[in-house]
Regions:
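Conserved phosphate/anionic-ligand binding catalytic regions in large, soluble enzymes, centered on
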Residues: 1-13
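Phosphate-handling active-site elements
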Residues: 11-22
């Protein structure tokens, strides 16, 4: 009898631009989830799902630097659940991937320097490394349950469906605001002309 809702963030500038496109009677452009200051990559893999990737690069033969974590992955939990186990290896094996790591992360930037076992990264592709370092998460856009203009719960298939449904309401608000500003300026004009 309950419901779950998850509406990802979208770029306010893209929302504004799409509202302007609707006002001009143009079709809105597709929007991807967006997070301020996120420098990773967001790719739509289906209409209901986007993949969010952090950033890492090779800084030497056995060294990598992580400069961005996926959205909603916190630095402390990342160290505990990903980096520390990579240093210890699995419980039933002597294998380990990391020799050491340094955490140069601060409040505004992510910066992990990873030192791998000699030749561990040799012949490893980007997909393997991304999976090893758990640098990808997914964002689902199929749980957007919101109140519609009539006040009933409605499941929206996309952010553009939400935008289109509320476009008429927004347009009326723009018209009311314009009328208010015109009447205010006209009243000021009358005061000054006396």
């Amino acid at each position: 009898t309950g419901y779950a809702t998850k509406v990802p963030n979208y770029n306010p500038r893209e929302i504004i631009e799409n509202l302007k496109r609707l006002i001009r009677k143009d079709d809105p452009l597709p929007m991807l989830p967006w997070f301020k200051s996120f420098t990773g990559e967001i790719l739509e893999v289906s209409p209901e799902r986007s993949v969010v990737s952090g950033r890492a690069y090779h800084a030497g033969k056995d060294t990598m630097v992580i400069t961005e974590l996926p959205i909603r992955v916190w630095t402390q939990s990342y160290k505990e659940s990903v980096l520390e186990p990579l240093m210890k290896g699995s419980e039933n094996s002597d294998s380990y991937a990391l020799v050491d790591y340094k955490d140069y992360t601060d409040e505004s930037t992510i910066n992990y320097l990873l030192k791998f076992r000699p030749d561990y990264l040799e012949n490893k592709d980007d997909a393997f490394i991304c999976n090893l370092l758990k640098l990808q998460t997914t964002i689902l856009t199929n749980q957007m349950v919101l109140f519609d203009p009539s006040g009933t719960l409605h499941r929206y298939a996309s952010a553009l469906d939400i935008l289109k449904e509320f476009y008429c309401i927004r347009l009326q608000k723009y018209i009311h605001r314009k009328e208010y500003m015109e009447s205010f300026l006209y009243a000021e004009f009358l005061k000054l002309s006396i």
